[in-house]
Regions:
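Compact integral membrane and secretory-pathway proteins
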Residues: 1-144
């Protein structure tokens, strides 16, 4: 057994991807098209995006060692790319609920979802590098 103190490590890739996943979930509460939120405009895609985001957050939980097994980096990358494709498809092809003359204007929610899904991809790619931050607690010295 090693007598060295063990420093908790935070995996950078899953952390970045999880921040992106939270942005995707938050974006669904915001307007995607002309005062229509993501949860209002979609029938199934909103639930799919939430499930993909939660799967990404599960990779962080696994990387922190809070559950037994973490999803492989390949699965995390596949989930992230699928999320980007779904969000990008909504930029190109508007859902029927948002269709109208000349098409609806895009609002902050869709752009936040695109940024969040992009962060998910960046985090999944960083997950392959297995970069982590070590956290070390030090005592304060009594002398100024």
């Amino acid at each position: 057994m090693s007598t060295e103190p063990r420093h908790p490590q935070v995996p950078v890739g899953p952390l970045v991807a999880s921040i992106g996943a939270v942005l995707v979930i938050v974006s669904l509460f915001l307007d995607w098209y002309d005062q229509i939120t993501g949860f209002t405009v979609f029938e199934f895609i909103d639930l799919l995006l939430v499930m993909l985001a939660l799967a990404t957050i599960a990779s962080l939980v696994g990387g922190l060692g809070l559950v037994r097994s973490a999803p492989s980096p390949g699965v995390a990358l596949g989930v992230a790319i699928f999320t980007v494709l779904i969000v990008a498809s909504q930029l190109v092809n508007h859902p029927p609920a948002a269709a109208g003359e000349g098409g609806p204007s895009k609002d902050i929610g869709i752009w936040l979802a695109l940024a969040g899904s992009g962060l998910m991809v960046v985090g999944a790619v960083l997950g392959y590098a297995r970069i982590s931050l070590a956290v070390e607690a030090r005592r304060r010295s009594d002398e100024p």
